[in-house]
């Protein structure tokens, strides 16, 4: 297995108005590993994730993604990962395909690259036959699958998922 450090969190702290949401957290994730950050509500999981995806700056400590500092090199770090938020990030009036096409344009994919990638992802998440229906007709699990396809669209080196199995049936969780 590749021993390249993909994520390196070192003594990370994040405080809000004197409350420590994350307190002296350290861990490493190696390339190719699947890593789950587990803990009770309010333990700082989402705060840690938001730090890794450059939405928050730590109060102290450091976090790097593929060797790049999440504070000093935030723009570069953002090109390295895909993100699937806990909250739905889809427009109910767009079709599944339209969501992916819109994101493809935002990622500056050519129409050909986008069409190829979208076809692959719709097959992967088993939404091919539903791709041209408005998202408002999708079940909760189908919407979650579309969120995952959106996170995978830029072919990221790292995929961050916040509550990845939320709304998925048991078979889809595997």
Q: Model-flagged regions — what are they?
A:
Residues 40-44:
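Walker A (P-loop) phosphate-binding loop of ABC-type ATPase nucleotide-binding domains
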Residues 93, 134-138:
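Conserved ABC ATPase signature
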Residues 101, 105, 110-130:
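Conserved ABC ATPase "signature" region
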Residues 148:
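Hydrophobic anchor residue at the start of the ABC signature
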Residues 155:
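Conserved catalytic motifs of ABC-family nucleotide-binding domains
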Residues 159-162:
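Catalytic Walker B motif of ABC-type/P-loop ATPase nucleotide-binding domains
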């Amino acid at each position: 297995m590749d021993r390249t450090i993909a994520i390196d969190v070192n003594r990370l702290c994040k405080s809000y108005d004197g409350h420590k949401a994350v307190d002296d957290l350290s861990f490493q994730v190696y390339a190719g590993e699947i890593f789950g950050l587990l803990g009770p509500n309010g333990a700082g999981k989402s705060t840690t994730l938001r730090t890794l995806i450059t939405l928050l700056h730590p109060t102290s400590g450091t976090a790097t993604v593929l060797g790049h500092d999440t504070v000093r090199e935030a723009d570069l770090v953002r090109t390295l990962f895909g993100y699937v938020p806990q909250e739905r990030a889809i427009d109910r009036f767009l079709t599944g395909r339209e969501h992916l096409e819109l994101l493809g344009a935002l990622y500056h994919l050519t129409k050909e690259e986008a069409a190829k990638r979208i076809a692959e992802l719709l097959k992967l998440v088993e939404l091919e036959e539903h791709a041209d229906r408005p998202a408002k007709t999708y079940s909760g699990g189908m919407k979650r699958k579309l969120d995952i396809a959106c996170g995978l669209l830029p072919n990221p080196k790292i995929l961050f998922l916040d509550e990845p199995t939320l709304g998925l049936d048991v078979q889809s969780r595997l």
